[in-house]
Amino acid sequence: MELTNSLGLLLGSSWASGINLYLTVAGLGIAHRMGWIVLPGNMDTLAHPLVIGVAMLVYAVEFIADKIPFVDSAWDSVHTFIRPAGGMALGYLAMVDAGPAVQYPVAVLTGAIALDSHLTKATSRAAINTSPEPFTNTIASVTEDAGVIGALYLIVKHPVIVSLLVILFIVFSVWFLKNMFRFLKRVLKGKNTRPTAELAGHSFKP
């Protein structure tokens, strides 16, 4: 693969893995089998029918779980290790022919990108769950899946564009995560202090 194509594949797939690992794996595998893209190294393992089938099956479970308030956050918590590990695996498989000197750093990089997109997703979902509106989770979930599908399309058709978008996302996520952690901290602090304040108010009643 050309450098731009390889970079687009690595950056795009690692970002998408942090959002929805199973849809990413299935999408890349199908794209390879259809001849839309040639996956490098041992990454063509994703095109095995069993891998695609298992990925689609687990994606079906995630498709439902991801739209239920608080269940989505529990699912994200479980995947805090799985999604970055999946991103690392994709980088490792793609660079198997380049040797350990390249393979390991690339795997760490793709894992870090997957962790970044996962934390952004998980944090935004935790913030959304503070809202009583039940349809917000569904909208967020559909938007995320659409983003993954869009990233897979750009990996195949416009690798340079997906590379630039991932870089911009990383820059944005630094600001976003910083502010969202502050927001969630204030929300949790408010929930913890409210009962104490109410108890104190009752204790001083005559």
Q: Where do the model's predicted regions map?
A:
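Helix-coil boundary and interhelical linker segments in multi-pass alpha-helical membrane proteins
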Residues: 1-5, 31-49, 91-106, 154-163
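Generic transmembrane alpha-helix signature in multi-pass membrane proteins
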Residues: 12, 89-94, 121-127, 148-156
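Helical membrane-embedded segments and adjacent short helical loop/helix-boundary regions
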Residues: 17-21, 44-55, 79-84
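A cytosolic-side transmembrane-helix exit/cap motif
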Residues: 43-50, 95-105, 122-134, 181-194
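C-terminal ends of transmembrane helices
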Residues: 60-73, 120-129
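Cytoplasmic-side transmembrane-helix entry/capping segments in multi-pass membrane proteins
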Residues: 73-85, 105-107, 132, 136-138
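Small-residue-rich segments of transmembrane alpha-helices in multi-pass membrane proteins
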Residues: 80-92, 136-150, 196-202
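Mid-bilayer segments of alpha-helical transmembrane spans in multi-pass integral membrane proteins
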Residues: 85-93, 103-123, 146
